[in-house]
Amino acid sequence: MKRFIFIILAILLIFSVCGCSGAPSEVTDEIPETTPAPETEPIPEDICLIGEDGKALYRIIRPDKGSEKVTQLAINLKKSISELTGVDFSIKSDFVMPNEKVDDAYEILVGATNRPESAAAREGLTVNDYVIRAVGNKIVIVGGCDMMTERAIKDFLSMLSSENGFKLAGGTDIKVEVERGDYIVALTNQGASLLEIYDITEGKLDESSLVWSYKMPYYNIAGTKLRHSEEHGDVALAVCGASYGCMVSYPAGELLWYTEAAANNPHSIELMPNGVIAIASSTGGEVRFFTTDKKVSNTAAASIPLEDAHGVLWDEERGVLWAIGRTTLTAYEVALSDGKVTVTEKTELRATIPSDWSHDLAPVYGNKDALWITTGSHVYQFDKNSKTFRTDYADHEVLDRANIKGIGNFDDGSAVFIYPDGAFKTWTSQSIFLLRNDKAEADVIKSETGHFYKVRVWDSRYQ
């Protein structure tokens, strides 16, 4: 569902008609009082994309350092608009040569270009918004994320037709806000090496429910989280491949930090308030810690052994990092001083998980004293105070099952989880399951194209 906010310039035509009738009036020396004509806004002219010579008047500009997605969107726009008009439109990056002047150039700006008009249009945009705006000789098409930029392009093309001479209405300034539902999740799509964010409120996993995506450089994307950084704002964390972990801005998708020095087969990643990132690796059997003051960090600042390490999660209340290994749940204090990371296990918090092969560690939203822990045979809620692994929690009849790779709950008590179907790999699935708080059985939500390993409630809160 879309809510359209249209900001349309008023077009006012004011005509003054003066008439005389009857006998001429007496001649007088007095100068009659007159009322000044009201000032009016100039009538904005329709924007012609094609010049009188039949050639394209505008060129398409894409960000030189934009994502592959936006680059392809700009190329697709060139193709579509050229086919629509029968006129060839050129395309180039926003890179400006020395002494090159672009202020007066007629340009269609796609995505977050370096032009000031793009920057102004992006102010205040969220991941759910996009803008189509005519400013002078620039047409700005930009979204709060790549998906929204794509939607903006589709709307822009729908405004053009042969009936109106392929003109854009003068003064066009449209902002669209796409309303989202209550159930936003992240999925690690191993079939395409994509981190994908979906709104599953309507029970769909398709293009209409896709909110955001980010292409990972390697195979087997495993774990992800949304966090808020004081320095960077909202960031997406992800791990994949043999030893790769990264932090990207959300939703801009700018790579802020990465490492290729995690232990083998990374499964989980966490950003702590002090800026340290922890990565748990299963095959490597370690949790490694990295500083993030530089964009690339290929030397771990600290590491601790943990057999079949699968999950890490920061606990704001207790000031510790929880971690799970094969049958172990434990916690660590993580200090950063003068660039040095010190990790100390809180042995009094260590507990033995009652079943083998732990898979996932997640917060129980609504209960800061509980954690979700999944294994090869059970789904537990761990009580931090009593150090007990409970299976008598709400909806355990549906949720406590074998081989769940990822689980989480929403504020209203609904839960989402995933377990393998083996269609792509033995640990992936095309479907996720949403247990709504008013239902006794989980909805099956299937993708026609994705093959997912982990599902994560897309929420920046640690607890």
Identify the role of each PLM range.
Residues 201-222, 254-262, 298-302, 344-351, ...:
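Aromatic (tryptophan-biased) beta-strands that constitute blades/sheets of beta-rich domains
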Residues 181-183, 232-235, 274-276, 317-319, ...:
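Short coil/turn segments that connect the beta-strands within blades of beta-propeller domains
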Residues 199-205, 291-296, 333-342, 383-393:
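Short loop/turn segments immediately following beta-strands, especially the blade-tip
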Residues 217-229, 263-272, 306-314, 353-366, ...:
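Repeated scaffold domains used in trafficking and secretory/extracellular systems
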Residues 185-191, 237-242, 278-283, 321-327, ...:
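Conserved beta-strand positions in repeat-built beta-propeller and related beta-rich domains
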Residues 32, 36-180:
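Solvent-exposed alpha-helical segments and adjacent loops
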Residues 15-35:
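Sec-dependent signal peptide cleavage junction
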Residues 208-270:
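Blade-loop segments of beta-propeller domains
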